[in-house]
């Protein structure tokens, strides 16, 4: 895959949500940007390096971030950081935004919607794979997009 300079490099970034998507964003940007991490369930985090980068709600309010990467499972209307995220909505991005900024020159197919995504993606994957295209399944049906 072709890579280009990423707009997320050399920035101050808050990653909110440390499930699969959040951790993959952390791994992708860890040595390229100054990262701050926040998760509602920080007691479950075992990794020492990640624990060191965890910040509190108060610290978040005192910082100015270039970007906020939020995990797909976070409902910005009902989460702990709801008011903060709404106030800073122009800074919110996802792992998909990071991926597309890295690989914008590549041909990508993205399937979104409520019903039928997995079936559609599996059919497309099989069709393209049979034609010898370099294809990968990511997201709900495979690995996080950044891994």
Regions found by a protein language model. Name each.
Residues 11-12, 27-30, 63-65, 73-147:
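Phosphate-binding loop of NTP-binding sites
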Residues 1-94:
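N-terminal leader/targeting and accessory segments in enzymes
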């Amino acid at each position: 895959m072709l890579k280009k300079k990423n707009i997320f490099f050399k920035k101050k970034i808050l990653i909110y949500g440390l499930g699969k998507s959040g951790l993959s964003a952390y791994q992708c940007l860890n040595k390229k940007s100054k990262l701050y991490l926040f998760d509602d369930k920080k007691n479950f985090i075992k990794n020492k390096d990640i624990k060191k980068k965890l910040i509190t709600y108060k610290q978040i309010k005192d910082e100015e971030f270039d970007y906020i990467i939020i995990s797909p499972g976070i409902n910005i209307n009902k989460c702990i950081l709801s008011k903060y995220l709404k106030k800073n909505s122009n800074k919110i991005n996802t792992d998909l935004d990071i991926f597309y900024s890295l690989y914008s020159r590549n041909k990508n197919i993205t399937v979104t919607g409520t019903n039928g995504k997995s079936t559609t993606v599996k059919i497309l994957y099989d069709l393209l794979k049979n034609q010898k295209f370099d294809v990968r399944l990511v997201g709900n049906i495979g690995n996080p997009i950044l891994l």
